Amino acid sequence: VVILLDSITRMARAYNTVERGTGRTMSGGLDSSAMQKPKAFFGSARMIAPQHGGGSLSIIATALVETGSRMDEVIFEEFKGTGNCEIKLDRGLADRRIYPAFDIATSGTRREEKLYRPDQLDKVHLLRRGLHQLPPQAGMEWLIKRIAATSNNDSLLDGL
């Protein structure tokens, strides 16, 4: 099962508005209890053991960042580091119609060593270091061309 949530920030704001508060207000006007249900919801994503029916629950959620709202910053910081992957979108790339429009430097997967063989992981690190040396637009354009020119991840990484 996959749940798409747009956005975890708005969900937390809604709970902050409708839940009975504790009277303890965090920075940005967020009540300290407002994050309990959104955190429990987000924390429910997991692989379910075969003895309990198997399967998994994946949650793909957006979070608002750089909005100028202190509350949004507090909410984001509460969830930051709890997911397996963070993809930060890049407005500059989107404005230029370069897709996928994500910031390569700040996006990534935690525990990527579980996704790649050791030789692949070394090449992924090499790829990231090379992309970090390029401006975002040039890096994404180069990566898109390389992906289009190869048939699979091994071919892409072997070509580095």
Task: Locate the predicted segments by residue.
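P-loop NTPase catalytic core
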Residues: 1-160
